[in-house]
């Protein structure tokens, strides 16, 4: 479990780096493209990212499910550590943009945040499953690329990315925690929707 937690911290860190790139550029299309570095490293290095691992909870035993809270906490630690470190550098200037993003996210009705989180992890599943199952190398990476770019450009809610934005924007509050939990549940629902649909259609 310790190795899983450490792997989850690293996963949170690379997602935070993706978020850093997104905050650093004005063009959201460019930002979405380079945000893909996070999921790319997670998949190629086998790191533990909650939004990816939760997709396969029904394909594994209870021991697998018990690792998910550990992974979530590790992701939170990783994103928070990167945000804290960045605030000790000139990258602290990114906090203003992060604050604006957080204000927008926290102004969404809870139902809306949940739905956007469901949609997000449908895209994550498409990306991760495409990487896992596509026999062609180019196809693997295109799956990651399109899955991430679509969820970002559509404004869908990714709980781990939001951990970073909340930390960088100094937006943590009871309301932010509530929203993050709702988004986490939405990500879980969206993540399992793909595998469940695949099983139903294959009968």
Stretches with model-predicted labels:
Residues 1-203:
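Alpha-helical transmembrane segments and their helix-helix packing motifs
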């Amino acid at each position: 479990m310790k190795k899983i937690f450490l792997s989850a911290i690293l996963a949170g860190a690379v997602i935070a780096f993706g978020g850093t790139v997104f905050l650093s550029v004005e063009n959201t299309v460019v930002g979405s493209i380079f945000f893909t570095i996070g999921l790319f490293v997670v998949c190629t290095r086998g790191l533990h990212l909650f939004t990816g691992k939760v997709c396969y909870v029904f394909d594994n035993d209870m021991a697998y499910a018990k690792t998910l809270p550990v992974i979530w906490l590790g992701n939170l630690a990783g994103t928070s550590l990167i945000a804290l470190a960045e605030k000790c550098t000139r990258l602290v200037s990114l906090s203003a943009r992060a604050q604006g993003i957080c204000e927008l996210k926290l102004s969404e009705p809870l139902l809306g945040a949940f739905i956007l989180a469901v949609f997000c992890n449908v895209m994550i599943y498409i990306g991760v499953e495409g990487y896992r199952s596509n026999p062609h190398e180019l196809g693997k990476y295109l799956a990651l690329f399109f899955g991430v770019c679509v969820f970002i450009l559509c404004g869908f809610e990714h709980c781990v990315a939001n951990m970073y934005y909340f930390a960088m924007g100094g937006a943590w509050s009871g309301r932010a925690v509530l929203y993050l939990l709702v988004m986490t549940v939405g990500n879980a629902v969206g993540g399992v929707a793909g595998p469940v649909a695949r099983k139903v259609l294959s009968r």
